[in-house]
């Protein structure tokens, strides 16, 4: 519980550095960006960290989240390309990736189902495998209000969740 507040602060401030860049980052594909735009975008964790450097009220855990939220387990992230970091950073990394996928920030927007599959395929490689399992169990694959097609090819709307994320209650 004592880690909850620093994680929340880090989660809220993790993309603060984006305000200091001009590179496009909404609903874009990395392949469409110029090398200079990618370079500039990859600076945002350092820019965010620098922006809060003198703020005494921000805990070190939160600072690390701001700096490391794009690092990955396999060392493929940025800006430092590290593969060893604390659990608080891994939590925000996973949440940030999911949010990016479904909101179209830093990548093309995809559905919740596609985002969950993408994260699942990266479990143990880019993201903490155990954490991915927990995360997926907490996220509704078909949120209330989602239009779905049943196995009998009938259309329906999700009205509630069940213990099985693949079988919500539909109307």
Predicted regions and their residues:
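Histidine- and acidic-residue-rich, metal-dependent catalytic cores
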Residues: 1-171
């Amino acid at each position: 519980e004592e880690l909850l507040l620093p994680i929340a602060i880090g989660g809220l401030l993790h993309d603060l550095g984006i305000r200091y860049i001009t590179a496009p980052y909404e609903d874009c594909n990395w392949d469409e960006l110029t090398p200079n735009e990618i370079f500039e975008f990859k600076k945002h964790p350092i820019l965010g960290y620098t922006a809060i450097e003198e703020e005494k009220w921000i805990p070190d855990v939160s600072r690390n989240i701001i700096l490391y939220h794009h690092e990955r387990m396999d060392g493929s992230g940025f800006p430092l390309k590290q593969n060893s970091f604390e659990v608080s950073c891994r939590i925000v990394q996973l949440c940030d990736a999911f949010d990016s996928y479904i909101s179209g920030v830093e990548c093309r927007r995809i559905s919740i189902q596609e985002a969950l599959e993408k994260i699942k395929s990266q479990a143990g490689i880019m993201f903490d495998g155990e954490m991915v399992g927990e995360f997926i169990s907490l996220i509704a694959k078909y949120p209330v209000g989602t239009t779905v097609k049943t196995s009998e090819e009938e259309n329906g709307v999700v009205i509630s969740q069940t213990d099985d994320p693949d079988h919500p209650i539909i109307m």
